[in-house]
């Protein structure tokens, strides 16, 4: 029969109210909504008594993470996030090579990602920095996560350019 899918929060809320009074319960809520709604949808889902699977970014403002941690403790439910680049075969293989290298090996990495965004992008929530978090949060987070997962913790971070449609800088990791 599949799982219910909702494009409107109000209908999802109604669905949750209906099943709350049955023997069924929500184990997980998967949140795939615009970035600026994640925080409220995570809070709602935890308070419903469900664990959460949320696409990136969990929140737009780092200070909201502390409150989400408190709600996790209060409810006993957990938040999980998805950063799918870690699952690509080529990325998994690269991580294995880096992990197998000598402990002192420092890699030289140049990552450039260029993609065009049509007018749709700038007229949608994705083009609004207050709703998406900007290009670094909306798109760059995948690359930051991938690089940190492969090469270790960030030891240096310098931003050279930051605008609505581009970001450039220098990142140094434990192994790159």
Language model regions located:
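Rossmann-fold dehydrogenase core element
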Residues: 65-85, 103-110
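Conserved S-adenosyl-L-methionine
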Residues: 155-163
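Active-site beta-strand termini and strand-to-loop segments that position acidic
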Residues: 170-175
């Amino acid at each position: 029969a599949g799982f219910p899918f909702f494009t409107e929060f109000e209908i999802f809320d109604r669905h949750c109210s209906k099943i709350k009074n049955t023997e069924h319960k929500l184990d997980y809520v998967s949140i795939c909504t615009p970035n600026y709604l994640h925080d409220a949808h995570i809070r709602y889902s935890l308070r419903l008594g469900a664990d959460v699977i949320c696409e990136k970014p969990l929140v737009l403002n780092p200070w909201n993470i502390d409150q989400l941690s408190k709600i996790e403790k209060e409810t006993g439910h957990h938040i999980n996030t998805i950063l799918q680049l870690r699952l690509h075969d080529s990325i998994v293989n690269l991580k294995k090579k880096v992990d197998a290298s000598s402990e002192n090996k420092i890699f030289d990495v140049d990552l450039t990602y260029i993609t065009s965004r049509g007018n749709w992008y700038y007229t949608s929530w994705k083009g609004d920095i207050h709703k998406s978090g900007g290009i670094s949060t909306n798109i760059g987070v995948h690359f930051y996560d991938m690089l940190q997962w492969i090469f270790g913790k960030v030891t240096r971070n310098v931003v050279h350019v930051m605008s609505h449609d581009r970001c450039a800088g220098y990142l140094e990791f434990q192994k790159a």
